[in-house]
Amino acid sequence: MRLGVAATPDVAIPTLDWLLGTDHEIALVITQPDKPSGRGRVLKQTTVAEWAEIHKIPVIKPQSPTELIGHLEDVDCVITIGYGVLLPQVILDIPRYGFLNLHFSLLPAYRGAAPAQRALLNGETVTGVTVFQLEKGMDTGPIYSQLSIKVEPHWRSVELLSELAHQGPNAVATALSMIEGNIKPTAQSGEPTLAPKITKEEARLNFSNSSESIVNAVRAFTYEPGAWCLWNDQPFKITSASVDGNQTLASGEVIVSEKRVFVGCGRDSAIELLTVVPAGKKEMPAIDWARGARLLGGENFG
């Protein structure tokens, strides 16, 4: 088939790479416009745009969905992967087989912008990917294919997203084969749940919560927007942590014991800090930060 791909983030790359090796043709890539980046606010294009340029595939960066009119009429199907733009039905109806979306959850669970992060936040042990027919409702369309994976307990969002991204080609392959075989997708069934975008304020850690919920928050929010708290009134990010069952500390209390750093949580529980990002610094082992901070005892995270 002659395909378009509408995508923005790095997680689209495994599927794009796979498509290059198939009999399908990537006729064009659609991605978001270049945006200012870094301290110099220099315009930077998306990872997907860079990929398309390397492989000499036409790229369009519409400011508005209506700019897609005139580009999709000779395309059989468009696959979207984290494109980040809601498309009206008039656009979805242009390609012969419409738009497919690769979504990082087992729909109808976790409809929305942050399915992988929400799954980690809720302590899910199984999640997966879904390829479905895109329609104007948010992640409500009928399903072509689903693949489930086990969520390893040490995975953070970066590791989970990487694994889900590498499951994408298999799910997309099944969906495209079904379309070519004139097999119709199946309506979603079950109780839907939502996965709205993570806000910075939501990512602030509350040490009165249980150690399990705080570790899940660290897993979910690393690295974007980052699980954070305050240390000496400055933002302080925790990028990896584990539950510890041997310490009894006040909520937010920080101690160093046997070259390990512990923080008290709610319900008489505690976590061990593994890696952190102090204000103005790069990521480092928690014990290195603690040595530099010269903890005296009685200090607390805010």
State where each predicted segment sits.
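An anion-binding loop in the catalytic cleft
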Residues: 207-302
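One-carbon transfer enzymes
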Residues: 1-225, 269, 278-280, 299-302
